[in-house]
Amino acid sequence: MAKQVPERSKPNAGKPSIRKVWSVNGHRLKRHKLLRDLVLIMIAPVLVYLMASLFTYSKDDPGWSQSGSAIVHNIGGKAGAWIADVLFQLCGFVAFLLPVALGVVSWIALFGSDQEEQAEGHLEPALRLVGIVGFLIAATGLFHLHLFQSDVARAGGILGKQVCNSLQAGFGVFGTNLFVLMLLLISVTLATGLSWFALMERIGRAVLAVPPLLQKSKRRADEWQHARALREEREEVRKIDAVQRAKRDPMKIELPPEPIVEKSERAKRDTQIPMFLGVNKRGSDLPSLALLDNPKPQIKGYSDETLEALSRQIELKFKDFRIDVQVVGAYPGPVITRFEIEPARGVKVSQISALDKDIARGLSVKSVRVVEVIPGKSVIGLEIPNVNREMIFLSELLRSKEYDKSPSSLTLALGKNIAGRPTVADLARMPHLLVAGTTGSGKSVAVNAMVLSLLFKASHNDLRMLMIDPKMLELSVYQGIPHLLAPVVTDMKEAANGLRWCVAEMERRYKLMSVVGVRNLAGFNKKVKDAEEAGQPLMDPLFKPNPDLSEVPRPLQKLPFIVIFIDEFADMMMIVGKKVEELIARLAQKARAAGIHLILATQRPSVDVITGLIKANIPTRIAFQVSSKIDSRTILDQSGAETLLGHGDMLYLPPGTAMPERVHGAFVSDDEVHRVVEYLKASAPVQYVDGVLDEIQTMDDGVVIGPAGFPESASGGGDETDPLYDEALRIVTETRRASISSVQRRLRIGYNRAARLIEAMETAGVVSPPEHNGDRAVLAPPPR
């Protein structure tokens, strides 16, 4: 039988677990608190009874010092009278301190014992009892020495008399005072644990804190006096201002006339929306204005009384900063109200501009914009937001006479100015536009309003668009309208290809205008139209027929405007980079006369996105609300956009000026955009141009547009160093056809370049020389 091995004893065997120790300590603490509450309940009535008996003591009551059958006047009855008599006879006036001392010591003993083992200064109950006895002896002695009377009950009692007589016999009166005072201090320390040195330190700190408190009180008193003087001065200024206001001319309040927007003839004609979009004759007309929502009645801004009171408040706020101004005019608008202020002599404009945030805080408004220079006036503008902001609908602007009478096919309806008048701009005069602002400032809505402005002004025969939408949200809704050159671009590599096609188209148009002898697209279209009406159409001077085919020159056609929309320019810059910046810069520099225009939008107005090269070639800019003055200077070269209100509030910098104009942008809903898009889809089929998004962009003469937008030399292409040589070699060896027209058609290049590629293959031994019928044999084997 195997020997049984005893189990090893655990090292902590026999020791109580932590949970058990906590449980025992918890029960013990609970019992201690219960006992403490019971003792407090018993002691409190005793102390109250003792105090009441002492305060109602009467010498006529029977007690320890006298007997009798008189009526007891003590509230504590016979026992109370007897106890009070004993205490007064023994302790004198100290009897009143006895209940207080017992109460203090009991409180310390009961509620100061939880941390008795950890905290210093807590003594044993026996020492507390010794302290109480010593306190009674010392107190009775002091009372007997300093409050001595013939009646012992009025001094320190019998106990005090005996203590003082015993000590005076040996130490005299001075020594007795010292010993009794020493006994009093020691007894208080034993009974309560009080440290006299700590008490003196607290008293010293309190004494040292008195002078700063006095100084602070004096400073507050001085400030109160100063504020009182300022209030009196302000009241005096108000009285003087009231007298001056009564004498001067009333403030000029120029209210906009009603109605602000006069309807055009087209707006009166387009009053009903077509019931069936599909029955519209294709290519017959522009979209009907009835497709857009009608404006709703809205609450106007400030009343005349409010404007008058607000102007006085503006003057008083400037007086608070020691600047004297006078409000001379108020011009309420749909979103903001401009107050024209005339500063006193010697007041700089910079002083007023530096107070824009303080004035906004004083007037309890979101922001205040200071217009430092108003052309034609010697006043300063102060633009304050209205309490009730009006919403501006796009239909109001498109129905206005300003939009309808604009002769340009590239008219943009931007919004309303501060007076409520429609603001329209000609993209052909800009000729390019940069739009920037933070998220939620109304930038995307403004771009949609610009697109609809162009669609309501020009048909697809007069206007073509290339839309680049990196976010795939804002411009993708226009997919399928006949105005598009290509589907809405969401791939940034295809965006670069589309921009290269625009550069190639720009170069082609310049060559056509040079041959025809005109300076811009309008002159070219007019000359083509006049030639057609005269029955002698102009032939394409750049047409090069294919020798293999019998082709005749094509007559020149009217060239449409091309507008390139880029919704988020910063994303495209991050993905494609420097290549796109060079293409955009090249278009911005030369594309105006060719009828090609750019509208760039970005929500990140930083210097790495809006570079100096782009700003130099796009002088027309629109800034929506931005977060800082730095962003505003990046867009407009000046501050101001950081004080805009958002939701379409913009600063429009027209071409050729340095003073931005404040415009409130129009709102266009998604439903309105969808209705217009469906109408255009039903009116004409989509007419995409082949090759717009191809990677290789080649002009009619075989010249390739390089990555930077510059045409490569024709003489440099067509040999084995040509970037298309490998692709042409693959096509020839796969199809087993060495045809110039086949290579030209497959690669979408010019005839001359395709011929040079075939000749390079002949030199390399890939194809044979041409036979008597012009055919070539493919000598190289097909690719595996």
Swiss-Prot record:
Q: How does it sit in the membrane?
A: Multi-pass membrane protein
Q: Where are the transmembrane segments?
A: 38-58, 68-88, 92-112, 129-149, 178-198
Keyword Ribosomal protein (UniProt): no
Q: Which CDD domains match?
A: TrwB_TraG_TraD_VirD4
Per the UniProt entry, the disulfide pairs are none
Q: Which SUPFAM superfamilies match?
A: P-loop containing nucleoside triphosphate hydrolases, Winged helix' DNA-binding domain
Compartment annotation: Cell inner membrane
Q: Which GO terms describe its biological process?
A: cell division; chromosome segregation
> Keywords of this protein's UniProt record, alphabetized?
ATP-binding, Cell cycle, Cell division, Cell inner membrane, Cell membrane, Chromosome partition, DNA-binding, Membrane, Nucleotide-binding, Transmembrane, Transmembrane helix
Q: Which residues does the entry place in the Cytoplasmic compartment?
A: 199-784
Q: Which family does it belong to?
A: Belongs to the FtsK/SpoIIIE/SftA family.
Q: What free text does the record give on domains?
A: Consists of an N-terminal domain, which is sufficient for the localization to the septal ring and is required for cell division, followed by a linker domain, and a C-terminal domain, which forms the translocation motor involved in chromosome segregation. The C-terminal domain can be further subdivided into alpha, beta and gamma subdomains. The alpha and beta subdomains multimerise to produce a hexameric ring, contain the nucleotide binding motif and form the DNA pump.
What this chain does, per the record?
Answer: Essential cell division protein that coordinates cell division and chromosome segregation. The N-terminus is involved in assembly of the cell-division machinery. The C-terminus functions as a DNA motor that moves dsDNA in an ATP-dependent manner towards the dif recombination site, which is located within the replication terminus region. Translocation stops specifically at Xer-dif sites, where FtsK interacts with the Xer recombinase, allowing activation of chromosome unlinking by recombination. FtsK orienting polar sequences (KOPS) guide the direction of DNA translocation.
Quaternary structure per UniProt?
Answer: Homohexamer. Forms a ring that surrounds DNA.
Q: Extract the PANTHER family matched here.
A: DNA TRANSLOCASE FTSK, SPORULATION PROTEIN RELATED
Q: What protein am I looking at?
A: DNA translocase FtsK
The organism encoding this protein is: Xylella fastidiosa (strain 9a5c)
